[in-house]
C-alpha cells in the first residue's frame, strides 16, 4: 500500500484479518505511514509479514533523478531499508544485488523479497535490475518474486520446476 497513514493503517488491518501471509507498503510513504502500517498489522489477530518496498527493480539511477532523488540507488535503498527496520517491519523488497552492501546494517532475521528474477532465456521486460534465481539466493534473498518468466512461459509448470532445481 502507499497512501495516507490512516488509509494504510486500515488497509493493513483489513488485509491481515483476511489472512494474507505477507503484505507490503512503500517505504517512501514516510515515517507516519510506516508506523500506521505496523499499527494496523499489530491490531489484527493475524500475524502476516509486513514488508517495505524500497526502490522498484524497474528503476535505475536515471529514474531516481527524474523524481528528484539525486543520490545513488544504493544510498537510497539503504536509507529506506534502515527506516523500515527502525519501524520494526519484517523486511524489504529490493533487488537481490542490493542486499550485500546493506545486510550488515540490518537485523539478522530481516526478510529480503527480491523481484527481477530472470532465467538467461528470459527477456528483461520492464525490469532494469535483474538477476538469475541462483545468484539471487547466493546474494541473500529470502523470497524470490518470479512472475513473467513463469506466467509467460510456453510451459509454466516446467519453467517453475527449472527454477526450483536451480535454487535447490
Predicted feature locations:
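Conserved, mostly hydrophobic/aromatic
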Residues: 23, 84, 102, 136, ...
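Short hydrophobic alpha-helical runs that function as membrane-insertion/retention elements
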Residues: 93, 144-146
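Conserved anion-binding
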Residues: 3-91, 95-99, 105-109, 119-122
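C-terminal helical cap(s) of enzyme catalytic domains, especially alpha/beta-barrels
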Residues: 34-40, 137, 150-168
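Catalytic-face loop-and-helix region of soluble metabolic enzyme cores
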Residues: 115-129, 139, 146
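Active-site cofactor/substrate anionic-group-binding motifs, chiefly glycine-
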Residues: 1-2, 144
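Short glycine-rich, acidic/polar surface loops and turns
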Residues: 98-102, 127-135
Amino acid at each position: 500500500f502507499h497512501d495516507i497513514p490512516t488509509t494504510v493503517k486500515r488497509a493493513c488491518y483489513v488485509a491481515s484479518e483476511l489472512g494474507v501471509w505477507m503484505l507490503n507498503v512503500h517505504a517512501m510513504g514516510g515515517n507516519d505511514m510506516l508506523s500506521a502500517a505496523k499499527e494496523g498489522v499489530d491490531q489484527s489477530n493475524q500475524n502476516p509479514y509486513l514488508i517495505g518496498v524500497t526502490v522498484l527493480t524497474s528503476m535505475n539511477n536515471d529514474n531516481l533523478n527524474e523524481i528528484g532523488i539525486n543520490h545513488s540507488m544504493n544510498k537510497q535503498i539503504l536509507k529506506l531499508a534502515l527506516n523500515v527496520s527502525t519501524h520494526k517491519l519484517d523486511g524489504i523488497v529490493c533487488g537481490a544485488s542490493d542486499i550485500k552492501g546493506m545486510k550488515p546494517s540490518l537485523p539478522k532475521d530481516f526478510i529480503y523479497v527480491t523481484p527481477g528474477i530472470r532465467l538467461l532465456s528470459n527477456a528483461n521486460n520492464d525490469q532494469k535490475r535483474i538477476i538469475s534465481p541462483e545468484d539471487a539466493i547466493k546474494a541473500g534473498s529470502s523470497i524470490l518474486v518470479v512472475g513473467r518468466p513463469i506466467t509467460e512461459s510456453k510451459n509454466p509448470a516446467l519453467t517453475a520446476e527449472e527454477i526450483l532445481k536451480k535454487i535447490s
